[in-house]
Curated annotation (Swiss-Prot):
EC number(s) from the headed UniProt entry: 6.3.3.1
Protein name: Phosphoribosylformylglycinamidine cyclo-ligase
Annotated source species: Azotobacter vinelandii (strain DJ / ATCC BAA-1303)
Gene3D superfamilies per UniProt: PurM-like C-terminal domain, PurM-like, N-terminal domain
Involved pathway(s): Purine metabolism; IMP biosynthesis via de novo pathway; 5-amino-1-(5-phospho-D-ribosyl)imidazole from N(2)-formyl-N(1)-(5-phospho-D-ribosyl)glycinamide: step 2/2
Catalytic activity: 2-formamido-N(1)-(5-O-phospho-beta-D-ribosyl)acetamidine + ATP = 5-amino-1-(5-phospho-beta-D-ribosyl)imidazole + ADP + phosphate + H(+)
Keyword vocabulary terms for this entry: ATP-binding, Cytoplasm, Ligase, Nucleotide-binding, Purine biosynthesis
GO biological process: 'de novo' IMP biosynthetic process; adenine biosynthetic process
Enzyme class: ligase
Recorded name of the encoding gene: purM
Domain of life according to the entry: Bacteria
GO MF annotations in UniProt: ATP binding; phosphoribosylamine-glycine ligase activity; phosphoribosylformylglycinamidine cyclo-ligase activity
Length: 351
């Protein structure tokens, strides 16, 4: 009877040395994102972070998210550099709408076979996103799981914790009829609607890698990283105290996300003609023959964030946002009403 040869973890498909090599490569990324409140570096069992000084009744705000099937498109195109920015954006933008300052971020990277170069590019993007948001990358998990994922395919999840003064939590409770709605532009589809986008690409037979739109590579338009709104919005909150509610426009578009911050007895009235929809959305609508209302229910259509302020604070809010580098515009207002349609879209284009 032949003796069973000695097996190693590597024989089973898990390369511990590759994992350790990745950790060494990303330590510098984590150091660049450090905040003074963070205690220690990567490698411990848990990450420690103090509450920043100056808070009287600090409330921690947490969030977790992924990037959906945009990840599949990233893998197909070999574009791994900015998907980490998307991951951070999806988490920190959800925190800032509560008025919270993001403190720290952790990531989860799962794959069938670890490609250290790809993973390092992804984590470098995560670090870039953390720098843009002002939060520290304090740790994460890299899981090599042969048999769970196909080859070097990978999945991502992000986790973020922020802090807000209890008396300054923004929850929409003060929103009232007559208030104004200000929009901030998106960079493209951000990280939502990509199952529809991929189906449109498939059925239209589009060569994503080779196609262009208005002289720009279609791949770049579709893979543009999700914008991170943290710093301009925190500036708006702190300098004006005027923000009553904010809605991060993700999956569900304007029609599903704005109602999440509206109190009973109010509805949002949006003027779709108040902005020029980026060409990539019109291209997707045409190629997929997508109904106009479906477009606004699935995609952000050029609007990444909506901010509610009192009507007499509009000019001040617009000025602060412009000074922070944003290009805001007045997109609509709040009206009284308890109907089933919490968001009314006016001036929808004919399709």
């Amino acid at each position: 009877m032949s003796k069973q040869p000695s097996l190693s973890y590597k024989d089973a498909g898990v390369d511990i040395d590759a994992g350790e090599a990745l950790v060494e490569r990303i330590k510098g990324v984590a150091r660049r994102t450090a905040r003074p409140e963070v205690m220690g570096g990567l490698g411990g069992f848990g990450a420690l972070c103090e509450i920043p000084a100056g808070y009287r009744q600090p409330v921690l705000v947490s969030g977790t998210d992924g990037v959906g099937t945009k990840l599949r498109l990233a893998m197909n195109l070999g574009k791994h550099d900015s998907i980490g920015i998307d991951l951070v954006a999806m988490c920190v933008n959800d925190l800032v709408v509560c008025g919270a300052e993001p403190l720290f971020f952790l990531d989860y990277y799962a794959t069938g076979k670890l490609n250290v170069d790809v993973a390092a590019r992804v984590v470098a993007g995560i670090g870039e996103g953390c720098e843009m948001a002002g939060c520290a990358l304090v740790g994460g998990e890299t899981a090599e799981m042969p048999g769970m994922y196909e080859g070097e395919d990978y999945d991502l999840a992000g986790f973020c914790v922020g802090v807000v003064e209890k008396s300054e939590i923004i929850d929409g409770a003060k929103v009232a009829a007559g208030d104004a709605l200000i929009a901030l532009p998106s960079s493209g589809p951000h990280s939502n609607g990509y199952s529809l986008i991929r189906k449109i690409l498939e059925l239209s037979g589009t060569d994503v890698a080779g196609a262009t739109l208005d002289g720009k590579p279609l791949a770049d338009l579709l893979m543009a990283p999700t914008r991170i709104y943290v710093k301009p919005l925190l500036k708006l909150i702190r300098e004006t105290g005027a923000v009553k509610a904010m809605a991060h426009i993700t999956g569900g578009g304007l029609t599903e996300n704005i109602p999440r911050v509206l109190p009973q007895g109010t509805r949002a009235v949006i003027d779709v003609a108040s902005w020029t929809r980026p060409a990539v959305f019109d291209w997707l609508q045409e190629k997929g023959n997508v109904d106009e209302r479906e477009m606004h229910r699935v995609l952000n259509c050029g609007v990444g964030m909506v901010v509610c302020v009192a009507r007499d604070k509009v000019e001040q809010a617009l000025a602060v946002l412009r000074a922070a580098g944003e290009q805001p515009w007045l997109i609509g207002d709040i009206a009284a009403g308890d109907g089933a349609e919490r968001v009314q879209l006016h001036n929808l284009k004919a399709h």
